[in-house]
Curated annotation (Swiss-Prot):
Residues 1-83 form the Phosphagen kinase N-terminal domain. Muscle (at protein level). One of its GO terms (molecular function) is creatine kinase activity. The lineage of its organism: Eukaryota, Metazoa, Spiralia, Lophotrochozoa, Mollusca. PROSITE patterns: PHOSPHAGEN_KINASE, PHOSPHAGEN_KINASE_C, PHOSPHAGEN_KINASE_N. GO terms for cellular component: extracellular space. CDD domains: arginine_kinase_like (cd07932). Residues 111-347 form the Phosphagen kinase C-terminal domain. Relatively stable below 30 degrees Celsius, but aggregates above 40 degrees Celsius. Flocculent precipitate appears by incubation at 70 degrees Celsius for 30 minutes. Stable below pH 9.0. Degrades by incubation at pH 9.5 and 10.0 for 1 hour. Substrate binds at residues 56-60, 217, 263, 305. It comes from Amphioctopus fangsiao. This is Arginine kinase Oct f 2.
Length: 348
């Protein structure tokens, strides 16, 4: 299987993925027969990237142990993607939540439509989608939901499994853009949708400012969000949820990598802090992308990666996930968004 996949990759002349760049014949021969303690193989890691030659990264981790067993290729991809000289990540640090110096980025309410911060988390005792069986997913859902149901205060809420979700709830959550689906072909090829929709679901707080996706791409995606630009409130809520969940669950992490995720692009802080912001003038300027790059920001359409902007509204987020702390990541995003607002205001 691995041999066939590697041959397909080598023959894909239009493929420019990081997998193709870094999985040399020498590395392939060295790694192809190895197995992780979860039973993961090199074939499990590279299947999606070989079947989808237009992949950007092209490699997933079959499980937390893959980052050790297949380090020779994964480390090379990680350094290239995260633009770092060596695989290194600091100890997690969310800052002093009582003294963050992060507030409302848009007090006027004229530009920022909404603010969202999310992290991914993986159970350390379960593999990632390529090695998971149906029973694993069900068990993981059970322990995740048990922890979620212990949340209190503004984080208290309800869990809705996808497997027996009513049409009304499904319609409402889709309209709210809260629901995830099984339409990503890269994830599909990586076994991300095996046994769909069993073992998957969504938890949200009563006022829907805190959500958790269970067994979407990662085991857990913790999401804090609200209308307007108060990044401080959104971030503080997320940190509170993370701290409470960490008391109940053991998450996969590695000293030099931070928190482990299915895709190596999300490693480290796993944090994506974003705003939906109206920038009709700045977005038309030829230097828009270079301004984003200067402040380590990523701009994309409001419906996710590879989508277009609607009415000059863009999703602006931090680009760097690895090699910096959570607090550094969110403050870097804050400084960048402040500059974006300044540039938009000064554009004619």
């Amino acid at each position: 299987m691995a041999e066939e996949l590697f041959k397909t990759l080598q023959n894909a002349k239009e493929c420019h993925s990081l997998l193709k760049k870094h999985l040399t014949k020498e590395r392939f021969d060295k790694l192809k027969g190895l197995k992780t303690k979860f039973g993961g193989t090199l074939a499990d890691c590279i299947r999606s990237g070989c079947k989808n030659p237009d992949s950007g990264v092209g490699i997933y981790a079959s499980d937390p142990d893959a980052y050790t067993v297949f380090a020779e290729v994964l480390d090379a991809v990680i350094m290239d993607y995260h633009k770092i000289d060596k695989v290194h990540h600091p100890i997690p640090d969310f800052g002093d939540v009582n003294n963050l110096n992060i507030g409302d980025l848009d007090p006027s309410g004229n530009m920022i439509v909404s603010t969202r911060v999310r992290v991914g988390r993986s159970h350390d005792s379960f593999g990632f989608p390529p090695v998971l069986k149906k029973d694993d997913r069900i068990k993981m859902e059970q322990v995740s939901v048990e922890a979620l149901k212990s949340l209190d205060g503004e984080l208290a809420g309800s869990y809705f499994p996808l497997a027996n979700m009513s049409a009304d709830v499904q319609k409402q959550l889709t309209e709210d853009h809260f629901l995830f689906n099984d339409s990503d072909r890269f994830l599909k090829a990586a076994s991300g949708y095996d046994d769909w929709p069993i073992g998957r679901g969504i938890y949200f707080s009563e006022n829907k400012t805190f959500l958790c996706w269970v067994n979407e791409e990662d085991h857990l995606r913790l999401i804090s969000m609200q209308k307007g630009g108060n990044l401080g409130e959104v971030y503080k809520r997320l940190v509170s949820a993370i701290n409470k969940m960490e008391k109940k669950l053991n998450f996969a992490k590695k000293d030099n990598m931070g928190y482990l995720t299915f895709c190596p692009s999300n490693l480290g802080t796993t944090m994506r802090a974003s705003v939906h912001i109206k920038i009709p003038k700045l977005s038309q300027r030829s230097d828009f992308k270079s301004i984003c790059d200067k402040y380590n920001l990523q701009a994309r359409g409001i419906h996710g990666e590879h989508t277009e902007s609607v009415c000059g509204v863009y999703d602006i987020s931090n680009k760097r996930r690895m090699g910096l702390t959570e607090y550094e990541a969110v403050t870097e995003m804050m400084r960048g968004v402040n500059e974006i607002i300044r540039e938009e205001t000064n554009s004619t």
